[in-house]
Every structure is written in structure tokens, then in C-alpha cells.
A protein has these predicted regions:
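Non-catalytic, solvent-exposed segments at the cell envelope interface
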Residues: 2-275
């Protein structure tokens, strides 16, 4: 089971990148106890103090989900393992149709959310995987697009093959190759079911990895407080405004570090627990 080490973590995310900002900035933990204060050292040349990025550590698991605005359909559900010491994010996709006995119901993850909301979805995900979920974050379609627009309105993804889909609620046409998809197209990318559930989850996992890798930037770290205030109103989470605290140091470390590993999908809950 992936647990918090020393009771502290710093995690700034986007859903699709969004949770990186919210979860880290509102964790309610004391950042200084976890990573210490930035040290100062002399350069030896100018004699001016130079800020040394502190070490960050801790592990946690987060549930990320996205669904329809009417709350009837769960488009995406995933567990994200955050390892701050390794500066890595591991993603395990959950099947919304997976049947789980949680609480008083034995129904699919999607039904757990529809009937019991995000809190019951979190409980069901824990029962399904055996992994403790430290925080959850859910966004509906409208919030998903708003958050991505706030964070730059685009992710670079590799489209593996041509997509030419015309459905009742949306149309998605993409040529193969690497390209930037805006917020509207990314939502269609998440919802598109072509190729079956496995192909859909492959696309969703690629988007989540891209969000973690592309949206933790120095500019976003600099504007984190303003971004947080916009984003927090667009999501459903077990994080409250009272949790909000300035964890800018950890975001700066992730944004400036040259040691970050590329985010990766794992094939099983057991693999996520080992990360």
C-alpha cells in the first residue's frame, strides 16, 4: 500500500495536470517539516547568497476522475502515485465499469459515483485496488475545460492513428502524429471510446502523463496562488479552502529540478503500490 512517509508531502497537480496545483497547495501538511527551508550558500565568486533547492520527499496516492456534467457518466478514473523523493508520478487507470463491493452496494465504479458521489467513489477505488487513497479530485466536463484553459489550454500528445469520429454529442477528427490539443479537443479525447476500453484508457493515460510532465512549469509556480483560486472552484474534492497554505517551495523544486522523471502508466495496482 502506498502510504505517506513522515506524514508529509508536497504535490502540485493539474487534472490532466490540474491536481498538481490543488493537492499540493491544500494538503494541510507543514511543508517546512517535510523539506526544510531553502539553504543559502556563497557562490565563491561574487559572495552573494545563492538559493539551493531543498530536497523533497514523501509518497501519496490520489484518485483523479472526470465525468459528465449531469453526473451520470464517469469518463475517466485513475490512481496517481506521487513519489516526491524520486520526483515521479505513476498512473494506474481504473475501469469505470469494474464491479466493486463497497459500503452498502455491489455495483460498478460509475454507479458508486452516481449514487454516492466522490466520497463513495474513493471508497470503491480503495476496495477495488487495496490501495489507500489519500485525496480525491473530481471534475465534470465544464470544469475540466476551464482548468485546462486556465493552465494554458493545450497539451502536446502523440495521436497514434487517424481519428474520424462523428457522434451524437461531439465530433473528433485528428490526423496521426504529435500535435497540441486544446481543452475542448482534450475532453473529446477523454470521452472518445473508439477501439474499446483499453484503447480509451491508453489515450487517457497519455494525456495524464503529458499533463504532469508539461504543466509543472516555472511560470505556473510563479502564478500558483492566482491559479489555485481559479481552479479550486471547478472541482469536487475532499480538500477544503481551510487546508490552503503556501507550498510554493515544493512547486519551485519540481518546476526547476532537472531530476524529474517522465510520468508513466503502470499496468496493475500491485505495480502502483510498489512505486
Amino acid at each position: 500500500m502506498c502510504l505517506l512517509y513522515d506524514g508529509f508531502f508536497s504535490f502540485v497537480i493539474v487534472f490532466g495536470g490540474l491536481s498538481l496545483f490543488i493537492l499540493g497547495y491544500t494538503s494541510g501538511f507543514d511543508l517546512e517539516k517535510m523539506i526544510g527551508k531553502p539553504e543559502e550558500s556563497n557562490t565563491g565568486v561574487s559572495g552573494e547568497a545563492e538559493t539551493v533547492l531543498p530536497e523533497i520527499s514523501g509518497k501519496a496516492t490520489f484518485l483523479l476522475a472526470c465525468g459528465s456534467d449531469d453526473g451520470q457518466t464517469l469518463h475517466l478514473a485513475a490512481l496517481v502515485g506521487a513519489d516526491m523523493e524520486e520526483q515521479s508520478f505513476s498512473i494506474y487507470m481504473l475501469d469505470p465499469d469494474a464491479r466493486v463491493n463497497a459500503g452498502l452496494r455491489s455495483v460498478s465504479l460509475q454507479e458508486h459515483y452516481r449514487l454516492g458521489g466522490s466520497g463513495e467513489l474513493k471508497l470503491a477505488a480503495e476496495e477495488l485496488t487495496g490501495i489507500k487513497v489519500d485525496r480525491y479530485l473530481y471534475t465534470a466536463e465544464k470544469g475540466f475545460k476551464t482548468v485546462l484553459r486556465t493552465l494554458g489550454n493545450g497539451l502536446v500528445l502523440n495521436v497514434p492513428s487517424k481519428i474520424d469520429y462523428r457522434g451524437e454529442d461531439f465530433t473528433l477528427r485528428l490526423q496521426p502524429g504529435e500535435q497540441t490539443l486544446n481543452a475542448d479537443t482534450l475532453l473529446k479525447w477523454v470521452k472518445y471510446t473508439g477501439g474499446g476500453r483499453q484503447a480509451q484508457q491508453d489515450r487517457q493515460a497519455q494525456m495524464l502523463c503529458a499533463a504532469f510532465d508539461q504543466l509543472i512549469t516555472i511560470d505556473h509556480a510563479r502564478d500558483a496562488e492566482k491559479l489555485f483560486k481559479t481552479i479550486i472552484n471547478e472541482v469536487d474534492s475532499d480538500i477544503s479552502m481551510l487546508d490552503f497554505t503556501n507550498h510554493r517551495v515544493a512547486l519551485e523544486v519540481l518546476a526547476r529540478s532537472g531530476q524529474r522523471k517522465a510520468s508513466a502508466r503502470v499496468a496493475s495496482a500491485a505495480a502502483l503500490a510498489r512505486e
